[in-house]
Every structure is written in C-alpha cells, then in structure tokens.
Regions:
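Auxiliary tRNA-acceptor-end handling modules of aminoacyl-tRNA synthetases
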Residues: 13-21, 35, 44-47, 56-169
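Short, Lys/Arg-enriched N-terminal segments with co-localized hydrophobic residues
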Residues: 3-15
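Active/ligand-binding-proximal structured segments within catalytic/core domains
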Residues: 21-40, 50
Length: 169
C-alpha cells in the first residue's frame, strides 16, 4: 500500500494518508461542525466543504464568534480527532430525512435537501453526535484527519445572496 504525504498551512505537520487532501479537509469541516454543535447547541448548519487552502463550515447561531472562540473550537476538535470517531454513512428516504432535519431545527439543511433530485439517494454522515446531510466522501475515522489549526472567522450570505441571512464561517 502506497501512502501519500499531504501538507497544508491549515495542518501543523505532514499527514500520512491514503485519502486525497480534499477528503481529509471535508472530514475536518465535519469535525469542526461537531465541535461547534457541542459548544453552541443552538447552531444551525448549512454547508462545510473543503477548499483549495483548507475547509470551512457555514452556520447560524445566537453567539457571534470572535477570534478567541477559535481556541475553544479547536480544542474541542482535537478531542474529537483524538477519539477516532468513525464517519458512518447511512441513507434515508426523503420523508424521514425531512422529519429528522425539521425536528432538529436544521432549516438550512432542509433547503439543501429540497435541492436534491427526487430520484437521488439521500445520504447522511454521522460523526459522534453530529449528523449531517452529505454525499461524502470522508476518512474512516476522525483520527485520520491529523492536526488542525483554525485561522479566521468570516461571514457569508446563505446561498451567496445578500438578500439572505448572513451566516458565520
């Protein structure tokens, strides 16, 4: 088995991995969302993709994040990474997915669910207590993410439209 080395400014060390960097970063975004959910249970989540230089997750919550909050989120992420939590994929039919997201108050995810074609599979990934509407892929467990460093906070309009609510990124 050949292992590849990946390096990013968002990672404090080289990571030996069988996964593409995009997959590692996307998984890191999920772990960040799980950490935010632990610290701020009222958070509503939109999307959390990998980017050319790292990853982000857009969310809406009462608490306005400041730079000092990044340390607490990062600390919670490191604990989740250390627990080597599995990324478990499961499918749901549309009605059950709508019910679950509605009961959880995840209004942005409900809108994203509506974008999925009627005949498409609806997949979720569970990492610890965090469950996310997501097509993947992900690493097998959070321990395969390696070290992370959160660098900044930004704002982003839902769906990139200034008429929509400003989310935190």
């Amino acid at each position: 088995m050949v292992k590849k080395f990946f390096y990013s400014l968002h990672y404090s060390e080289r990571i030996m991995s069988n996964y593409p960097l995009e997959t590692i970063r996307h998984s890191a975004a999920h772990v960040m969302a799980a950490a935010v959910q632990q610290l701020y249970p009222d958070a509503k989540f939109d999307i959390g993709p990998s980017t050319e230089n790292g990853f982000y997750y857009d969310f809406d919550m009462e608490h306005r994040l400041v730079t000092e909050d990044l340390k607490a989120i990062e600390k919670a992420m490191k604990k989740l990474i250390g627990r080597k939590l599995p990324f478990e994929c499961f499918e749901m039919n549309r009605a059950d997915a709508e019910k679950m997201l509605s009961e959880a108050g995840q209004t942005y995810k409900l809108e994203r669910l509506a974008d999925i074609p009627e005949d498409a599979k609806i997949t979720f990934y569970k990492t610890g207590d965090f469950v996310d509407l997501c097509r993947g892929p992900h690493v097998a467990n959070s321990g395969e993410i390696g070290a992370v460093k959160l660098l900044s906070i930004a704002g982003s309009y839902f769906r990139g439209d200034e008429k929509n609510k400003m989310l935190q990124r």
